[in-house]
Amino acid sequence: MRGVATDIGTIHFIGIGGIGMSGIAEVMHNLGYRVQGSDIADSYVVEGLRKRGIKVAIGHAPENVDGVAVVVTSTAVKRGNPEVEAALAQRIPIVRRAEMLAELMRLKSTVAIAGTHGKTTTTSLVAALLDAGGIDPTVINGGIINNYGSNARLGASDWMVVEADESDGSFLRLDGTIAVVTNIDPEHLDHYGSFDAIKDAFVEFIENVPFYGAAMLCLDHPEVQAIIPRIRDRRIITYGFSAQADVRGTNVTPGPDGNRFDVVVRDRDGNSRTIEGIHLPMSGRHNVQNALAAVAVALHMGVPDEKIVSGFNGFAGVKRRFTKVGEIVTDEGVVTVIDDYAHHPVEIRAVLSAAREGAGAGRVVAVVQPHRFTRLRDHMDDFQQAFNDADMVLALPVYAAGESPIEGVSSDALVRGLRDRGHRQANVVADADALAASLAASIKAGDLGAGDMIICLGAGDITKMAAGLASAVEGAA
């Protein structure tokens, strides 16, 4: 960090396997700092860090912080954690993840990408276009960028692209030179208390942009559009499908290999031009919207049109964003298994719409693992209306993520609501074995076959089930 030598001692990350923590740890390691960490379990993220030379202990123990200079924690790590308590006893400084990220951002000019949904994909797309334009940014993302094989990378330029997490309000520490807001929906109400407070936080995030920076705002989203009049003395560039957008997507044509579209760009003098023939190798209209945010950033930073087109062509996607993880071979043909991080009703609706687009005449089976009892409680009505594009819904038990159960809030309640709203095939499955057995029975009955898609949805451990689902179903047949 600027003005701080890299020999300050060892920096210890508690929960280093978390997707946000790991990115900061990796970049700091690449900058030359001594970095280590701990996590409660092995994971692909932990293995990736070890391959890069970062020591990771499994399990939290007081001795893990012996001799370290500073401890970094996320909001998920609370008092009572043995490493936190040991650090306090030894008077070792403890800093939050967002504070450390903010220190990294002081090194460079930054594109900070916020929004209730679409942050990770948009961050990845911005990085891809800046790479194509020769800018070579440092990147810290909330998901694995397939082109990098990691969620972080140290670039050679003076620019950094970061995903700004609004969940605990800490994104207000991240002062971007360029800010992007993809959308604003009622989420993380346990922290903010009200939707108005969430909107106020996004206004403050935008106002943190310096006078020489810019804010890229999605004009299609009503709540984003509604806060624009509140922004004073900051340059605003709008994007979306709206005819009023400065960067507007047109002629969107979905296909089996993603989307093709054009972009109409209008400058401040009212003149316009069109970037034609963009190919985005991702399904879903919502991903075209994310791509438009990336176009807005790239154009503002001087990336030529032809480099924008080539940047999209070379984009390899993001792990757990509509990721194909397997195929189930049936007598009729192949059923595709997709893994996706979607865990909010808006996200689920968008992913299932993309699946319906991709499946064509095929059937779409949604396997959902609700994430957190509070989220399911706060959005139960929306969840019960989010599965209209799924021919069949199989709901696993709620992934608690450390929360205590809430009476009346369960996957059974979700399924009852789906049925009450007219869904013809919605059922609860108890675990991974029951899921495999249910899908195998559907294949045997001829209800699932060639051209069909199984979409696994959730932010919990459903990703592990998705990875092994094809072999589990074939074994249960």
Swiss-Prot record:
ATP binds at residues 115-121. This is UDP-N-acetylmuramate--L-alanine ligase. Cell wall formation. Pathway: Cell wall biogenesis; peptidoglycan biosynthesis. GO terms for cellular component: cytoplasm. One of its GO terms (molecular function) is UDP-N-acetylmuramate-L-alanine ligase activity. It is found in: Cytoplasm. The keyword Zinc-finger does not apply. Its EC number is 6.3.2.8. It catalyses: UDP-N-acetyl-alpha-D-muramate + L-alanine + ATP = UDP-N-acetyl-alpha-D-muramoyl-L-alanine + ADP + phosphate + H(+). Belongs to the MurCDEF family. Keywords: ATP-binding, Cell cycle, Cell division, Cell shape, Cell wall biogenesis/degradation, Cytoplasm, Ligase, Nucleotide-binding, Peptidoglycan synthesis. PANTHER family: UDP-N-ACETYLMURAMATE--L-ALANINE LIGASE, UDP-N-ACETYLMURAMATE--L-ALANINE LIGASE-RELATED. Its main location: cytoplasm. The keyword Cell wall biogenesis/degradation applies. It comes from Sphingopyxis alaskensis (strain DSM 13593 / LMG 18877 / RB2256) (Sphingomonas alaskensis). GO terms for biological process: cell division; cell wall organization; peptidoglycan biosynthetic process; regulation of cell shape. It comes from the Bacteria. HAMAP family: MurC. It holds the Pfam family Mur_ligase.
